Amino acid sequence: MIALGCDHGGFVLMREIIKCLDERNLPYKNFGTFSEDSCDYPAIAEPISRAVAAGEFEKGILICGTGIGMSIAANKIPGIRAALCSDSFSAEMARQHNDANILVLGARVIGTGLALYILDTFLKTPFEGGRHARRVAMLGDLENCR
């Protein structure tokens, strides 16, 4: 199951992503926001990131204007490996090599078509494991240094 959320800057793109998920019969929970009214991205990123980190959701998708704020906020939560992706190769590598568990998109940076292509790549690409598993474990060790 996918946890999905956006701030006001990502609302229009999130509606398109919801259509895509519905067409594919992919289960998700929409954490909001539910309008284009201004809201604070950390308030959206935190519950989604905590739910993904707790294992309640397999993956998450966060959307804001640039993706930067959501990415920073999500990566504050231990266990989260949020990747801001503006191309499909980055999404593929984020999954294959970094076991990214949250995809972050910048709605004002990329168009809908590219966003859906990135989403497809992120969702279908498995984690490669092997030497990359060791590196992901090292990221977890860094979280414990706080």
Annotate each predicted stretch with a short phrase.
Residues 47-84:
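Helix-adjacent hinge/juxtasegments
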Residues 3-23:
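Glycine-rich phosphate/diphosphate-binding loop of Rossmann-like nucleotide-binding domains
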Residues 46, 50, 72, 92-95, ...:
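Alpha-helical segments flanking ligand/cofactor-binding loops in enzyme cores
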Residues 3-5, 9-10, 88-146:
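C-terminal binding/interaction regions
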Residues 37-46:
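Structural motif
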Residues 27-38:
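A short beta-strand-loop structural module common to alpha/beta enzyme folds
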